[in-house]
Amino acid sequence: MIQLFEVKKKIKKEDNELLNKYSEISKKTKEEVLKEYNTSESGITENKATELLEKNGPNVVVKNEKKSRLYFLFNSFKDKFIIILIVLAVINYFLSDALSTYIILGIAVISALIRYFQDYSVYKFNQELKAKMYTTTNVVRGGKEKEIRVEKVVPGDIVHLSAGSMIPADIMLIDSKDLFVNQSVFTGESVPVEKVAQSTNDAKEIFSISNVCLMGSSVVSGRATGVVIDTGFTTYLGRMSKEVETKKEPTNFEKGMNNITKMLIRYMLVVSVAVFVIYGFIRKDWLEAILFALSVAVGITPSMLPMIVNVNLTRGTKVLAKKKTLVKNINSIQNLGAIDVLCTDKTGTLTEDKIVLQKYIDVNGNEDTSILEYAYLNSYFGTGMKNLVDRAIIIYGNEKNVKEIVNDYTKIDEIPFDYTRKRMSVVVKSNKNNGYRMFTKGALEEILKVCTKVKYNGHVNELTPEMVEIVEQKAKEYAVQGMQVIAIASKREYRGVNVFNVSDESNMTFIGFVAFLDPAKKDVKSTLKKLKNIGITTKILTGDNPYAANNICNLVGLENTETLLGTDIDKMSDEELAKKVEEVNVFARMNPLQKERVVKQLKNNGHVVGYMGDGVNDSPSLHIADVGISVNTATDIAKEAADIILLERSLKVIYEGVLEGRRVYGNIIKYMKMALSSDFGDVFSIVIASIFLPFLPLLPIQMLLQDFLYDISQIAIPYDDVDKEFLEKPKKWSTKGISKFMNVMGITSSLIDVLAFLGFWFLFGYNASKETFFQTAWFVECLISETMIIHYVRTAKRPFIESRANKWLTLGTFGTIIGTILTPILLHNIASFHFEILPLKYYGFVILLLAIYSVLVEIIKKIYIKKNGEWL
């Protein structure tokens, strides 16, 4: 994973080139820049825009390569198991009959084609969803303002910006009014920076150029017009994205599948060679030994594994899409179900991301309507873009009928807000006595700087150091409750002038406070409880102050005994942090690298971590997390780094996604454990039979047909239900767990087969003189028992009574059982299969074996669960 400082180091040379280029452009006049880009204030024409779009490409900073059907078709046949089947078919063609070769090829082709259709279906589905996720911007073309998609912006476009706008490209400003831009995606600093339509400095960093706005930034307040000077990968953001775009580590699911594949290939080679040697030495027929070993190899190969896995993942992708979740990497669905720690910010996830006025109080802590009135006048008469604080004051004032007070005053002037003073003032004249008043609101420390008096206990007093301490203590009381505290001051003006400036903000009287809360989302408390109930610990990683973070945690019921600050983390060793991340649920004043370190340490502690973020600075944590989660309003780089994109920023959506991830995992693990234990049991039985029987227990062609019919019975597994109890705990991929289950159930299956062999030989007389009857009998018994036992393996509960399979799986399994009974009858006259018609009493014996098998499996299930804590 590339760290941000490494990214900046790598692009330092290009960064300097771009800095020099933009610095030169920034020093040019508006007319010179318009001429250089062959444009005007009326914008370029549509024809010119089309030409430039073809020349420069779309205005995007992440690659979206289109993939053809041929790509997916070729990729489907690249699967290891498909390749093994094809190789076995080729060998079989030269050593045996054509029919068995066609059966092997048929299995391989059908599996590959199903995977092709499923993979291509997911790709098309995701492309359609991505097409619906776009951002627009306002440009002037041919003298007319219009709204276009950001990817269609070209150099020379004239762009209009206002509060809330995303900067759609790298832009040089040609006009601005009180413009403040948030550049935290590059700098990590949340404080907006003022931008003006003329160069005011010799910048040392590209984002410090005063009249250049960079793609990926956003407008906090004010308005502006600019000329697009770079788009796409030539922008600063685009150059960064080339370095941030790195191949993500394989998910636990991908690692697990690779391990299983390697294990099965080794197992197939060892068993096939063993069968070949044993059969060859005992029978002295080495050609038949090769054919039989090849058939065993095919039987061991879970040919439907790619299809079952992909159908499961595809179905999960489509289900999540309906729940407002876009899955970019389908293999991350299983990881989503495995999450046991979720790291997220509080703003917009736990809260509504809109502030509400809660208090208007004096220094004594008493409600004072005059404070609300002063704040209302300040916000109402301010001509700049109304920020969240202004809107909250006006909305609350209207509800309290304070708005009538504006009729008593006439606005004279204002001193706009800026991020140096962190305050804003308006001067009004009373319509009753013509007296002038200045009302100022802003950050507590900045308001105190311009005050010499304070209203306290109903009287105006000198603002002594002792009084400052009282004021600060009262403000802290509300800050501890998680409130944003804004200070209010006023003074009377007697100069009789109508123009005021910053120097007039002096000798003021401190009046009191207005306090705000970003309220918790209504469903967050219940959703956090649900997440906890399914084994997920939620941890807050925020850049906000610890008071606000702890308050919102109290409101939503998030348990926390200690809050860790970013500065605390910097002082800790990895060993100390490893302990703290287990104990602490709230991390405040965090920068991106500190967040990444916490996520990394949680992973090192053995957790499966989900990380939710939406900025460029979140990309390191999104990359390193087991599941990176972003939102559709996030920066392009954040969305590219994420595995999953939410169309709605909500913990409820994540909760539903986790459950779906566990359903997907549950159905995949069902198939894995069923198929592998069945294959292992069959092979174990074959080895035993090869030693003691004077003939093959199954012919190669019968074995291939049996394997094919068994696979068909499991096609509906992706649509099966999963027990509620299974969804209550995180599910980690465990190759050892699969291997252990395979051994236990495989041996159990072989015990039933041995009973069947004894019954066929001694009860029915299917001995050397009736080997075709023996082979037919085992073909039917083995396939029926393997198919029926699906219902016992799929749940930790009692099948048919406490847990029932989905109707499609039920139809599939019972359909296969009926097909199995009919197969010897229908293929009796085809010599290649060597099937016989079995007597009715044989099926009574099979029913007895099934009863014994069922009871045995239920006993083993209880013992296995008691010892291992789980069944699937």
Regions found by a protein language model. Name each.
Residues N92, Y102-Y134, R141, T251-T344, ...:
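Hydrophobic alpha-helical transmembrane segments
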Residues K525-T527, N533, N545-V556, L593-Q601, ...:
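Acidic, divalent-metal-coordinating active-site segment for phosphoryl/phosphodiester hydrolysis
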Residues M1-E145, E151-V154, V159-H160, G164-I167, ...:
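Non-lumenal N-terminal regulatory segments of integral membrane proteins
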Residues V271, V275, P306, V556, ...:
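Membrane-embedded transport module
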Residues L53, V212-V220, N335-F510, F516, ...:
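Cytosolic catalytic regions of ATP/NTP-dependent phosphoryl-transfer enzymes
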Residues P58-V90, Y123, E145-K146, A203-V212, ...:
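Soluble-to-membrane junctions at the N-terminal ends of transmembrane alpha-helices
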Residues T776-L872:
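C-terminal transmembrane module of polytopic membrane proteins
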Residues I83-I103, M263-T301, T314, K318-K324, ...:
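Helix-interface capping motifs at the ends of transmembrane segments in multi-pass membrane proteins
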